[in-house]
UniProtKB/Swiss-Prot annotation:
Gene that encodes the chain: purQ
EC number(s) from the headed UniProt entry: 6.3.5.3, 3.5.1.2
Record's function text: Part of the phosphoribosylformylglycinamidine synthase complex involved in the purines biosynthetic pathway. Catalyzes the ATP-dependent conversion of formylglycinamide ribonucleotide (FGAR) and glutamine to yield formylglycinamidine ribonucleotide (FGAM) and glutamate. The FGAM synthase complex is composed of three subunits. PurQ produces an ammonia molecule by converting glutamine to glutamate. PurL transfers the ammonia molecule to FGAR to form FGAM in an ATP-dependent manner.
Official protein name in the record: Phosphoribosylformylglycinamidine synthase subunit PurQ
Stretches assigned to the Glutamine amidotransferase type-1 domain: 1-51
Source organism (scientific name): Lacticaseibacillus casei
Record note on quaternary structure: Part of the FGAM synthase complex composed of 1 PurL, 1 PurQ and 2 PurS subunits.
Localization annotation: Cytoplasm
Keywords associated with the record: ATP-binding, Cytoplasm, Glutamine amidotransferase, Hydrolase, Ligase, Nucleotide-binding, Purine biosynthesis
Catalyzed reactions per annotation: N(2)-formyl-N(1)-(5-phospho-beta-D-ribosyl)glycinamide + L-glutamine + ATP + H2O = 2-formamido-N(1)-(5-O-phospho-beta-D-ribosyl)acetamidine + L-glutamate + ADP + phosphate + H(+); L-glutamine + H2O = L-glutamate + NH4(+)
Active-site positions on this chain: 20, 22
Pathway(s) where this gene product acts: Purine metabolism; IMP biosynthesis via de novo pathway; 5-amino-1-(5-phospho-D-ribosyl)imidazole from N(2)-formyl-N(1)-(5-phospho-D-ribosyl)glycinamide: step 1/2
Biological process (GO), any one: 'de novo' IMP biosynthetic process
GO molecular-function terms, A-Z: ATP binding; glutaminase activity; phosphoribosylformylglycinamidine synthase activity
GO terms under cellular component: cytoplasm
């Protein structure tokens, strides 16, 4: 319906998605288009205080 591939909550800190970016992170396997998803996760969590996080 409407070609929706993913959804987030209002604050953007919860993501649900149908594509599999982990399958597109190695050029040897056909492409690196999925790297952006994982790089953004790294960028957002670097320096974050995760003590006590569960």
């Amino acid at each position: 319906m409407h070609d929706i591939a993913g959804v987030t909550n209002e604050t953007g800190n919860v993501l649900g998605m149908m594509p599999h970016p982990e399958r597109a992170v190695e050029a040897l396997l056909g492409g690196t288009d999925g790297l952006g998803v994982f790089q953004s996760l790294i960028n957002q969590t670097e320096g974050a205080d995760v003590r006590g996080a569960r």
